[in-house]
Amino acid sequence: MRGGLTAFLLVAALAPVPAAPAPEPVVASVEVATRAPNNPRAKFWYRLPRGHDPARRERWRVLVLFGGRNCDGRPEVSGKLGWAAWADLNGVVLVAPTFRDDAYWEPRAWSGRALLDALAVLAARFGTSPRGLLFYGYSAGSQAANLFPAWRPDLCRAWVSHACGVFHEPSAGMRGVAGLVTCGDADAARYVLSRRFVDLCRARGVPVAWRSFPNRPHDVPEASALGLARAFFGAVASGAPCACWGEDGTWRVLERERIDPEYRSPLYTPALAELWRRPR
């Protein structure tokens, strides 16, 4: 009997211990003080991805999301437009502000400093990286999504603006920051402004990718615009050098030298190029 008990205990001791379940996503917020009259305490919602481990050695990349004008921020990090699932897959922390007016899309006045303060809090708590930032915005949020990177290009890796009506002045400082501009061609006024900005960037040596969507009004098509944005961030964040180029308008993927500079979209990877060529 004693031998049987000993054998049982030995087998039990050697049995593999079930792995602890991966931590669930966490959605919460931090607040920072500002001097803006309508934003004395600016709130920033954040979402830690599924399986997050603050003790890991590699710092978490951050994607800053700007929704429509005066958006709450919480829906943006909680799954709106599909960013939560993408963040889980790629190990990205989502951050979205709750700004109210005070020209918050202009970062030089006050909102840029507020964002940096919030990111510093998250870096101290969770090990997020204050550099290599990604920015995405649509409609009014698309203004902030390109104006913030232009304010501090040294902190930004890539940005995407969809259906935008206000852009920054292209400068040499943005040459190392990847950008993607998208718009529905039925969103006539924003389409013209977006295309004019892309032309100006390329004339000044700032590479920006462009994609329009036929017969799309002022909306955010999930499968095409958002799918392309997510693939763009993934390709750029991989660190791969740009290996593919597309020709605006014909949507053909060609050798770089065969495309006139004014129509040349940097597409980085074959997977991104295929999605750009035939957006789903």
Predicted regions and their residues:
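Short substrate-entry loop that stabilizes the transition state in hydrolases
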Residues: 52-104, 188-191
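Short, solvent-exposed loop/turn and secondary-structure capping segments
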Residues: 57-58, 73-78, 106-108, 147, ...
